[in-house]
Amino acid sequence: MFTPQQDPHLYQHQKKTLTQTFSMLCWNVHKENMHPRFHLQLQQLLLKHPSDFLLFQEYKMPKHLPHGLKDFSYAMAANMETKRHIYGLLTASSFSFESRYIELTHAKELLFSTKKSMLLTSHPFADGDTVHIVNMHGINFVSFKVFSQELVKIKTVLQSCEDKMIVSGDFNNWSKRRIQALEEFRQSLSLEKALVQEEHHIKRVFSKPIDHIFYRGLKLTRAEAIDTKKVSDHNPIHAVFERL
């Protein structure tokens, strides 16, 4: 394992702007996305829960083989690379990408000596208005002080973003202090927390849910956690948004 040297991206929908209603699927796939059972589960999910955006954490991308997202444009924020694979965040969409920005944590996780990443992408409506999509995986296996410092670092980046925003991912907020730090992060960016149906399907650590969706400037039509029968150690959250 070593520091990533590339952040793959492919844009093939650059003439397709956001629609007034759009949907997303957020999922920590636990590096399971190359298994046939994952592809079968994803196909079934997308048939029942069509999604314009896929926000994956712990995505495993082969360097020299097809990766299974041929119908989507995508951007990746890698936090780890090996001879054959790249790992990290992946945001895929059937809409155009206006920009992307990648932020790696300064600190490394103690057990694996890897950093975590944040991927910020922007997607335009036809009139030029923009939605910022933030895909996050909060750092783990560090002190609370380091966790909090990394959140502040990301907050500073996002404070420069105006307009509509969705922040989603695995935040690793499994303690009272981490929950409070994330709540302060949410409030500082004027974000609302999505109320998720079937919340008991959300991944929990020490009985605390760690996968979340936050948003502003949009109407949340619905959000639902979906039981995928342990394809990953997390379940996906599907959400539908409308432009105000």
Regions found by a protein language model. Name each.
Residues 1-9, 51-130, 226-228:
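Structured beta-strand-rich core segments of catalytic domains in phosphoester-bond hydrolases
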Residues 1-23:
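Acidic, histidine-bearing metal-coordination/catalytic regions of metal-dependent phosphoesterases
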Residues 145-156:
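Alpha-helical scaffold elements lining the catalytic groove of polysaccharide deacetylases
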Residues 15, 21-39, 81, 108-112, ...:
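Acidic/histidine-rich helix-loop elements
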Residues 129-132, 136-143:
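Metal-dependent phosphoester/phosphodiester hydrolase catalytic core
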Residues 17-18, 92-95, 120-128, 215-216, ...:
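Active-site beta-strand termini and strand-to-loop segments that position acidic
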Residues 38, 75-93, 110-114, 173-238:
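Active site of divalent-metal-dependent phosphoester/diester hydrolases
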Residues 22-29, 42-65, 121, 132-136, ...:
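Active-site beta-strand/loop signature of hydrolases that rely on acidic residues for catalysis
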